[in-house]
C-alpha cells in the first residue's frame, strides 16, 4: 500500500468553505456577506478492510492522525506495525485505509468496539463505564523543562493554526523543544484529533522530537492526558484548565500536567519535579 500525501495542499482555504452570513455589531446589523467556515468531515479509520472508528475531523494531516490514534489507543506499539496508509474519498467523507500487521489486527478484532466520535469523544462507543480509561504504564522521570522558555512557545502556537486564523474554529497541538521553540504542530476542529495528529507526527520524526513537551490550545481532558501518556509524553501544557479526571489520570501515570498556561504564569497540577523555574 502506498503512503500518499492526500492532505498536502497549497492553500489553507482548501479546508474552509465560504458561507453567506449576517454580521451583528452594536447598533449595526450588516447585510449578508461571505465569510470563511472551517471544514469538518467524517473520517473513517479502516484497518485491513474493517472500519474501526469514524471521527469528525479537519480533512488534512490524516496519515498523522491515523498513526497517532493507533498509538494512543494502544492498537500498535510502534509505527513499524503499520505497513502503509492510503487516504481515499468515501461517501460523504474520507477513509484512511491502514495496512496493519497481522498480530496487531488479531488483537484489534479481539477488543474491537463501535466507536462513533464527535470531534474526539473518549466515551462514545464504550459499552460499560468500567471500560473508560486504559491501563497506562507509569512514565519515567527522564525529562525536565524550564518554565522560562514556555512564553516563546505560547507566542508562536497559533502559527500552526492557519485555518483557525481564518475561521476561529480550530484547536492546535504542538511539540515544544526544551528551548521553547516549536518543532512542529497541527490543527483540527477536534482537540483530541489535533493531539493525535501531533502524536503521530512525533512518532515518525527524529531525535529532536524525543525531548520536550506537548502544548495544546484547549483544556486538558482525561483522554488527552491518557493519549499523551500512552505515547510516552511526560509533560503536557494546556492553555486552558484541566478536569478532575485528567488530574487523577496524570497523577497515576506520572505525567506532569500544567494548565492555564499564559505568558509568565501557569498552574501546575501534577508532578512539578520535572519543571525548572528561573
Swiss-Prot record:
Localization, UniProt: Cytoplasm
Active site, UniProt feature: 121 (cysteine persulfide intermediate)
Short name of any one Pfam family annotated for the protein: FdhD-NarQ
Domain of life according to the entry: Bacteria
GO MF entries: sulfur carrier activity; sulfurtransferase activity
Keyword terms, alphabetized: Cytoplasm, Molybdenum cofactor biosynthesis
Predominant subcellular localization, coarse grouping: cytoplasm
Gene Ontology biological-process annotations: Mo-molybdopterin cofactor biosynthetic process
Amino-acid positions noted as binding Mo-bis(molybdopterin guanine dinucleotide) in the UniProt annotation, renumbered to this chain: 260-265
HAMAP family on file: FdhD
NCBIfam families (alphabetical): fdhD_narQ
Family: Belongs to the FdhD family.
Function description: Required for formate dehydrogenase (FDH) activity. Acts as a sulfur carrier protein that transfers sulfur from IscS to the molybdenum cofactor prior to its insertion into FDH.
Protein name, entry field: Sulfur carrier protein FdhD
Organism, scientific name: Salmonella paratyphi C (strain RKS4594)
Amino acid at each position: 500500500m502506498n503512503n500518499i500525501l492526500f492532505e498536502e495542499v497549497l492553500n489553507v482555504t482548501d479546508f474552509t468553505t465560504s458561507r453567506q452570513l449576517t454580521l451583528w455589531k452594536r447598533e449595526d446589523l450588516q447585510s449578508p456577506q461571505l465569510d470563511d467556515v472551517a471544514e469538518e468531515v467524517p473520517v473513517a479509520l479502516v484497518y485491513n478492510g474493517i472500519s474501526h472508528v469514524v471521527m469528525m475531523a479537519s480533512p488534512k494531516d490524516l496519515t498523522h492522525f491515523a498513526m497517532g490514534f493507533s498509538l494512543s489507543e494502544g492498537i500498535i506499539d510502534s509505527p513499524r506495525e503499520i505497513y502503509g496508509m492510503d487516504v481515499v474519498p468515501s461517501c460523504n467523507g474520507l477513509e484512511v485505509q491502514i495496512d496493519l500487521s497481522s498480530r496487531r489486527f488479531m488483537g484489534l478484532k479481539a477488543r474491537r468496539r463501535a466507536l462513533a466520535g464527535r470531534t474526539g469523544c473518549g466515551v462514545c462507543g464504550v459499552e460499560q463505564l468500567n471500560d473508560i480509561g486504559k491501563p497506562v504504564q507509569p512514565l519515567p522521570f527522564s525529562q525536565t523543562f524550564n518554565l522560562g522558555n514556555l512564553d516563546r512557545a505560547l507566542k508562536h502556537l497559533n502559527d500552526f493554526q492557519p485555518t483557525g486564523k481564518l475561521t476561529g474554529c480550530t484547536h492546535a497541538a504542538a511539540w515544544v523543544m526544551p528551548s521553547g521553540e516549536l518543532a512542529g504542530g497541527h490543527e483540527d476542529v477536534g482537540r483530541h484529533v489535533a493531539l493525535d495528529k501531533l502524536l503521530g507526527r512525533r512518532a515518525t520524526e527524529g531525535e529532536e522530537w524525543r525531548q520536550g513537551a506537548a502544548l495544546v490550545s484547549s483544556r486538558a481532558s482525561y483522554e488527552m492526558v491518557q493519549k499523551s501518556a500512552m505515547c510516552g509524553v511526560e509533560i503536557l501544557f494546556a492553555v486552558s484548565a484541566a478536569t478532575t479526571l485528567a488530574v487523577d489520570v496524570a497523577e497515576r501515570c506520572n505525567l506532569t500536567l500544567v494548565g492555564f498556561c499564559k505568558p509568565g504564569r501557569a498552574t501546575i497540577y501534577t508532578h512539578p519535579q520535572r519543571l525548572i523555574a528561573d
